[in-house]
Amino acid sequence: MVGYFDYLAGKEIYSNYNVSFPHKIFTIDDLLSISTMEMDINPKTVLMQEASKWFDARRSGRNENVLLSSFTGQSGKRDIDIYYDDQFITRIDRGLRDITDYTFMSNCMRLDPYNSKSQPLMFEYEKYHGYFVYPTGKTMRFPAGFMEQFYEMYNTREPTAPLIKNERGD
């Protein structure tokens, strides 16, 4: 959803999964090259699904993660906003977690749990400042009717590519 609003604001959108608005699919090599390419400061948004597949905390210290940390370290200088998701935030390497400004924990709740009729779901996002700090008490609630416009923007069952270790001896 946030990536769509960035697109409407004129930012270039890069994603490791398909979305229904104009974007460029990026690979792990694209991320690794950002820290060494000519300075490009046009505003960009990177959308990353299943971030721990690439930023895996269990590989911390390996060459791949060191290079990926170069990407996260350069993101502010290159005007790149990174939006990512994962089911297990503790599996994400610290290089990405350390630059996280906000964390949203999401859940769905029925509007009326006592009504026997089917009720739309409401999406509730609790906003945290930084990585796993105390909630600010600000809860953002989005009715299902509002969220429906975003449902068709991507396929939640689309598999994302894992990081494939190269055979160059690292």
Locate the predicted segments by residue.
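A conserved mid-domain beta-alpha-beta active-site/ligand-binding segment of alpha/beta enzyme cores
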Residues: 117-170
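Detector for Asparagine
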Residues: 16-18, 42, 63-65, 107, ...
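Conserved P-loop
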Residues: 1-37
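Serine/threonine-rich low-complexity intrinsically disordered regions
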Residues: 3-4, 27, 38, 107, ...
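Conserved nucleotide-sensing/catalytic segment adjacent to the nucleotide-binding pocket
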Residues: 22-78
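Structural motif
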Residues: 14, 45-49, 83
